[in-house]
Amino acid sequence: MRCPSCNSLDTQVKDSRPTEDSSVIRRRRVCVTCNFRFTTFERVQLRELTVIKRNGRRVPFDRDKLMRSVQISLRKRSVDPERVEKMVSAIVRELESGGESEVSSEAIGEIVMEHLRDLDDVAYVRFASVYRNFREAKDFEAVLGELSAEDETPRLAPVRK
């Protein structure tokens, strides 16, 4: 692994451990050349995904870009970062297990919105406003109406014994 400080390829792993859900390996590394310490994360990648943008351009899927867009929608919201990480991992697993090597940006946006709806209503509305390119207040009203309708949908009470 190349050192982010001095670009040396001579680094050593000092500590390696799985995350709580064992989906990621966290490694603490140190550069032998400059003694810079840094952390890397290793994840399973089921397949190489290509994103088909709205303009037809194809770009490699970027998990970090997905994480950044979710974090922007969650800015100043009190959501546990671990829940965000689990949500993004679930989205990536869903995309990778879909059987297709190419996925549209629209499909990714819809999946993200499904997950955000369960995580945080405000983040859902923020993400929807960018993803759906809101232009007027009525666009926000429509999404808020969707959330209200979902909240009013009767849910079955749990069966108690």
From Swiss-Prot:
Keyword Transport attributed: no
Keywords: ATP-binding, DNA-binding, Metal-binding, Nucleotide-binding, Repressor, Transcription, Transcription regulation, Zinc, Zinc-finger
Function recorded in the entry: Negatively regulates transcription of bacterial ribonucleotide reductase nrd genes and operons by binding to NrdR-boxes.
One Gene Ontology molecular-function label: DNA binding
Biological process terms in GO annotation: negative regulation of DNA-templated transcription
Comp. bias intervals (Polar residues): 1-11
Family statement drawn from the similarity comment of this UniProt entry: Belongs to the NrdR family.
Official protein name in the record: Transcriptional repressor NrdR
Pfam family, one: Zn_ribbon_NrdR
Origin: domain of life: Bacteria
Cofactor: Zn(2+)
Region (Disordered) location: 1-20
Stretches assigned to the ATP-cone domain: 49-139
Zinc finger (unnamed): 3-34
Family matches, as PANTHER family: TRANSCRIPTIONAL REPRESSOR NRDR
Cofactor mode of binding and number, as noted: Binds 1 zinc ion.
